[in-house]
Protein backbone atom coordinates (compact mmCIF):
# COMPACT_ATOMS: atom_id res chain seq x y z
CA UNK A 1 0.00 0.00 0.00
CA UNK A 2 1.07 3.60 -0.41
CA UNK A 3 0.32 6.54 1.89
CA UNK A 4 -1.61 9.32 0.17
CA UNK A 5 -1.87 12.89 1.48
CA UNK A 6 -4.90 14.70 0.08
CA UNK A 7 -5.10 18.45 -0.52
CA UNK A 8 -7.12 18.72 2.71
CA UNK A 9 -4.24 17.19 4.64
CA UNK A 10 -6.12 13.96 5.24
CA UNK A 11 -4.07 10.79 4.83
CA UNK A 12 -5.30 7.52 3.44
CA UNK A 13 -3.79 4.24 2.29
CA UNK A 14 -4.04 3.13 -1.34
CA UNK A 15 -3.90 -0.59 -2.23
CA UNK A 16 -1.76 -1.48 -5.26
CA UNK A 17 -3.79 -4.33 -6.71
CA UNK A 18 -3.39 -4.07 -10.47
CA UNK A 19 -0.83 -1.66 -11.91
CA UNK A 20 2.12 -3.64 -10.50
CA UNK A 21 1.61 -6.13 -13.33
CA UNK A 22 1.42 -3.63 -16.18
CA UNK A 23 4.17 -3.29 -18.82
CA UNK A 24 6.71 -0.63 -17.93
CA UNK A 25 6.30 -1.03 -14.15
CA UNK A 26 8.69 -2.74 -11.72
CA UNK A 27 9.26 -2.85 -7.96
CA UNK A 28 12.65 -2.44 -6.32
CA UNK A 29 14.09 -2.31 -2.82
CA UNK A 30 16.13 0.67 -1.59
CA UNK A 31 19.17 -1.31 -2.77
CA UNK A 32 17.89 -0.89 -6.33
CA UNK A 33 17.16 -4.56 -6.93
CA UNK A 34 13.96 -6.38 -7.80
CA UNK A 35 12.78 -8.86 -5.19
CA UNK A 36 9.53 -10.31 -6.53
CA UNK A 37 7.34 -11.18 -9.47
CA UNK A 38 5.39 -7.92 -9.56
CA UNK A 39 2.41 -9.60 -11.25
CA UNK A 40 1.83 -12.06 -8.41
CA UNK A 41 -0.94 -11.46 -5.86
CA UNK A 42 -0.61 -8.65 -3.35
CA UNK A 43 -0.31 -11.25 -0.59
CA UNK A 44 2.71 -12.87 -2.27
CA UNK A 45 4.14 -9.44 -3.10
CA UNK A 46 4.25 -8.33 0.53
CA UNK A 47 5.44 -11.74 1.74
CA UNK A 48 8.40 -11.37 -0.63
CA UNK A 49 9.02 -7.82 0.58
CA UNK A 50 9.11 -8.93 4.21
CA UNK A 51 11.43 -11.82 3.36
CA UNK A 52 13.80 -9.53 1.44
CA UNK A 53 14.00 -6.86 4.14
CA UNK A 54 17.04 -7.11 6.45
CA UNK A 55 16.24 -7.55 10.14
CA UNK A 56 15.69 -4.21 11.83
CA UNK A 57 14.99 -2.32 8.60
CA UNK A 58 11.63 -0.84 7.61
CA UNK A 59 9.92 -3.03 5.00
CA UNK A 60 9.53 -0.75 2.00
CA UNK A 61 9.85 -0.81 -1.75
CA UNK A 62 9.49 1.58 -4.66
CA UNK A 63 7.13 1.01 -7.55
CA UNK A 64 8.68 2.49 -10.68
CA UNK A 65 7.16 3.44 -14.04
CA UNK A 66 8.35 5.28 -17.10
CA UNK A 67 6.42 8.09 -18.79
CA UNK A 68 4.48 5.77 -21.08
CA UNK A 69 3.38 3.45 -18.29
CA UNK A 70 2.26 6.30 -16.03
CA UNK A 71 0.33 7.89 -18.87
CA UNK A 72 -1.40 4.65 -19.80
CA UNK A 73 -1.98 2.94 -16.44
CA UNK A 74 -1.35 5.48 -13.70
CA UNK A 75 0.66 4.61 -10.61
CA UNK A 76 -1.19 4.00 -7.37
CA UNK A 77 -3.39 6.98 -6.54
CA UNK A 78 -1.92 8.92 -9.48
CA UNK A 79 -4.36 8.45 -12.34
CA UNK A 80 -3.54 7.85 -16.01
CA UNK A 81 -4.02 10.32 -18.88
CA UNK A 82 -5.85 12.69 -19.28
CA UNK A 83 -4.93 13.45 -15.65
CA UNK A 84 -1.48 14.90 -15.01
CA UNK A 85 0.82 13.92 -12.11
CA UNK A 86 1.24 17.52 -10.93
CA UNK A 87 -0.88 17.25 -7.78
CA UNK A 88 0.76 14.00 -6.66
CA UNK A 89 4.22 15.43 -7.27
CA UNK A 90 3.33 18.50 -5.23
CA UNK A 91 2.29 16.45 -2.20
CA UNK A 92 5.35 14.21 -2.48
CA UNK A 93 3.26 11.11 -3.15
CA UNK A 94 5.04 10.68 -6.49
CA UNK A 95 8.75 11.13 -7.05
CA UNK A 96 10.04 12.05 -10.51
CA UNK A 97 13.40 12.13 -12.26
CA UNK A 98 14.24 12.93 -15.85
CA UNK A 99 16.72 10.06 -15.66
CA UNK A 100 16.91 6.92 -13.53
CA UNK A 101 19.85 8.45 -11.69
CA UNK A 102 17.78 11.51 -10.77
CA UNK A 103 14.91 9.33 -9.61
CA UNK A 104 17.25 7.18 -7.54
CA UNK A 105 18.54 10.30 -5.79
CA UNK A 106 15.00 11.48 -5.03
CA UNK A 107 14.11 8.11 -3.49
CA UNK A 108 17.46 7.30 -1.83
CA UNK A 109 17.79 4.22 -4.03
CA UNK A 110 21.19 2.81 -5.01
CA UNK A 111 21.60 4.45 -8.42
CA UNK A 112 24.11 2.02 -9.91
CA UNK A 113 22.12 -1.03 -8.87
CA UNK A 114 18.91 0.53 -10.18
CA UNK A 115 20.47 1.19 -13.58
CA UNK A 116 21.63 -2.44 -13.77
CA UNK A 117 18.21 -3.70 -12.65
CA UNK A 118 16.31 -1.70 -15.27
CA UNK A 119 18.75 -2.69 -18.00
CA UNK A 120 18.35 -6.35 -17.07
CA UNK A 121 14.57 -6.10 -16.89
CA UNK A 122 14.42 -4.31 -20.25
CA UNK A 123 16.37 -7.20 -21.74
CA UNK A 124 13.81 -9.63 -20.29
CA UNK A 125 10.99 -7.54 -21.72
CA UNK A 126 12.57 -7.59 -25.18
CA UNK A 127 13.15 -11.35 -24.98
CA UNK A 128 9.65 -11.98 -23.60
CA UNK A 129 10.87 -13.94 -20.57
CA UNK A 130 11.70 -12.91 -17.01
CA UNK A 131 14.31 -15.46 -15.97
CA UNK A 132 14.69 -13.93 -12.49
CA UNK A 133 11.10 -14.08 -11.21
CA UNK A 134 9.13 -15.56 -14.15
CA UNK A 135 6.74 -12.65 -14.38
CA UNK A 136 4.11 -13.40 -16.98
CA UNK A 137 4.61 -17.17 -16.82
CA UNK A 138 1.27 -17.90 -15.13
CA UNK A 139 -2.27 -17.31 -16.32
CA UNK A 140 -2.84 -15.21 -13.19
CA UNK A 141 0.09 -12.95 -14.10
CA UNK A 142 -1.11 -12.49 -17.66
CA UNK A 143 -4.65 -11.73 -16.54
CA UNK A 144 -3.29 -8.79 -14.55
CA UNK A 145 -1.37 -7.44 -17.54
CA UNK A 146 -2.43 -5.45 -20.57
CA UNK A 147 -4.17 -7.85 -22.96
CA UNK A 148 -2.16 -10.72 -21.46
CA UNK A 149 1.13 -8.78 -21.68
CA UNK A 150 2.88 -7.96 -18.41
CA UNK A 151 6.50 -7.43 -19.49
CA UNK A 152 7.46 -4.06 -20.93
CA UNK A 153 10.65 -1.97 -20.81
CA UNK A 154 11.19 1.24 -18.86
CA UNK A 155 12.80 3.49 -21.43
CA UNK A 156 11.02 6.83 -21.76
CA UNK A 157 11.74 9.49 -19.14
CA UNK A 158 10.74 11.12 -17.01
CA UNK A 159 10.57 8.20 -14.61
CA UNK A 160 8.23 8.03 -11.62
CA UNK A 161 8.16 6.18 -8.31
CA UNK A 162 5.82 5.69 -5.38
CA UNK A 163 6.79 4.25 -1.99
CA UNK A 164 5.17 0.94 -1.05
CA UNK A 165 4.59 -0.24 2.52
CA UNK A 166 2.96 -3.39 3.93
CA UNK A 167 -0.73 -3.14 4.78
CA UNK A 168 -3.42 -5.47 6.08
CA UNK A 169 -6.68 -6.64 4.55
CA UNK A 170 -7.86 -9.02 7.21
CA UNK A 171 -6.78 -11.00 10.26
CA UNK A 172 -5.85 -14.59 11.00
CA UNK A 173 -6.25 -14.31 14.77
CA UNK A 174 -9.45 -13.56 16.63
CA UNK A 175 -12.14 -14.98 18.86
CA UNK A 176 -12.41 -18.76 18.81
CA UNK A 177 -15.83 -19.90 17.58
CA UNK A 178 -17.68 -23.12 16.85
CA UNK A 179 -19.43 -24.14 13.64
CA UNK A 180 -22.37 -21.87 14.54
CA UNK A 181 -20.09 -18.81 15.04
CA UNK A 182 -20.70 -18.92 18.79
CA UNK A 183 -17.73 -17.55 20.74
CA UNK A 184 -16.03 -20.17 22.91
CA UNK A 185 -14.71 -19.67 26.43
CA UNK A 186 -11.44 -21.02 27.83
CA UNK A 187 -13.06 -24.43 28.27
CA UNK A 188 -14.08 -24.39 24.59
CA UNK A 189 -17.74 -24.04 25.55
CA UNK A 190 -20.13 -21.60 23.77
CA UNK A 191 -20.74 -18.33 25.60
CA UNK A 192 -24.53 -17.80 25.59
CA UNK A 193 -25.67 -15.03 23.26
CA UNK A 194 -22.18 -14.12 21.99
CA UNK A 195 -21.30 -14.55 18.31
CA UNK A 196 -18.39 -13.44 16.14
CA UNK A 197 -17.95 -13.34 12.37
CA UNK A 198 -15.70 -11.67 9.81
CA UNK A 199 -12.36 -10.32 11.00
CA UNK A 200 -13.45 -10.61 14.65
CA UNK A 201 -13.58 -14.38 14.27
CA UNK A 202 -10.42 -16.48 14.20
CA UNK A 203 -9.92 -17.08 10.48
CA UNK A 204 -10.74 -20.51 9.10
CA UNK A 205 -7.73 -20.00 6.79
CA UNK A 206 -5.35 -20.01 9.77
CA UNK A 207 -3.02 -17.35 8.40
CA UNK A 208 -3.13 -18.38 4.75
CA UNK A 209 -4.53 -16.24 1.95
CA UNK A 210 -5.42 -18.52 -0.97
CA UNK A 211 -7.42 -15.96 -2.95
CA UNK A 212 -8.44 -12.34 -3.21
CA UNK A 213 -11.55 -11.60 -1.14
CA UNK A 214 -11.06 -14.75 0.92
CA UNK A 215 -12.31 -12.97 4.07
CA UNK A 216 -15.66 -12.19 2.43
CA UNK A 217 -17.00 -15.71 1.90
CA UNK A 218 -16.59 -16.88 5.51
CA UNK A 219 -18.04 -13.58 6.80
CA UNK A 220 -21.15 -13.99 4.65
CA UNK A 221 -21.52 -17.69 5.44
CA UNK A 222 -21.19 -17.41 9.19
CA UNK A 223 -23.23 -14.21 9.20
CA UNK A 224 -26.03 -16.17 7.54
CA UNK A 225 -25.70 -18.95 10.12
CA UNK A 226 -25.85 -16.47 13.00
CA UNK A 227 -28.93 -14.80 11.54
CA UNK A 228 -30.59 -18.16 11.03
CA UNK A 229 -29.79 -19.21 14.58
CA UNK A 230 -31.07 -15.96 16.09
CA UNK A 231 -34.24 -16.07 14.02
CA UNK A 232 -34.93 -19.57 15.27
CA UNK A 233 -34.44 -18.50 18.90
CA UNK A 234 -36.71 -15.47 18.50
CA UNK A 235 -39.36 -17.66 16.94
CA UNK A 236 -39.36 -19.91 19.98
CA UNK A 237 -39.54 -16.91 22.33
CA UNK A 238 -42.61 -15.56 20.54
What are these regions (language model features)?
Residues 1-238:
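Residues forming the flavin
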